[in-house]
Amino acid sequence: MALKASPDDQKLLLDLQALDTKLAQLDHRAKSLPQHAVLSALDAELMTLRAAALERRGAREDVALELKRLESDVEVVEARIKRDTERLEGSSSVKDVAALEQELTALRKRRDDLEEIELTVMERLEEAEASLAVATENMAGIDERRAAVEAERDASLAEVASERTHTAANRQTIASKVPADLLALYTKQRDRYGIGASLLQYGVSSANGVKLLENEMQTIRATAPDDVIICPSSDAILVRTNESGL
């Protein structure tokens, strides 16, 4: 037996469909906010900067370790120079004095060479620290920009959520007025085909903009106003009004 519903109840489906369409649009808007793409780009940039910072931090640590080894080598040489100087001052043996002076000359040259290398490494360390500082500053800039974009996104999402809550409440009000069997059919068609109700306006189905054939219009004209009919082109419940062209 065909489903029956008063024309007024059927017209409620158009309001329900409009609200469902708006809810879908709000969900799409929430997923399509421009901030989402900006945040993804910033995250990718931040990942690149973090990798660069990690590499530069490792390079700085390597140079710092090299400098520490050089400083240790200089300390060892300084200690040997001090020891040999003390031995030289206390020695009366010509042979020992000659040997100590020769060793001191070699040690002083070694110390000078190490200190020269040390200066070069210190310059490299300064460069490495400056490079790391730039990477760190760049990351801080991205973090700051990201926080600002997140705030914009959250504000937009809150606005959408508020509008969605209001729309959902309106939908609930309309749905409560629709007979249960008619609402069940509407829900079934909407879940299956994407649209639950379509307005027939001057022979055109609003669900897809398709003009119905004359034989289809003749069939519709032959149905009672309280007959619930399915649109032959969109499979939505076809709602008839004074503007349907019947």
Each model region followed by its residue ranges:
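Amphipathic alpha-helical coiled-coil segments
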Residues: 55-67, 107-128, 174-175
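Short metal-binding segments enriched for Cys and/or His
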Residues: 236-246
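Short, charged, amphipathic alpha-helical segments
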Residues: 40-47, 71, 97-105, 125, ...
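Short, non-ligating residues that shape and space the ligands of small metal-coordination modules
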Residues: 214-218, 240-241
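Short coil/loop "hinge" linkers that interrupt or connect long alpha-helical coiled-coils or helical hairpins
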Residues: 69-106, 190-215, 226, 230-235
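Long amphipathic alpha-helical coiled-coil segments
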Residues: 69-80, 114-139, 185
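Short, charge-rich amphipathic alpha-helices with coiled-coil/heptad character
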Residues: 2-7, 21-61, 133-149
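Coiled-coil termination/hinge junctions
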Residues: 146-210
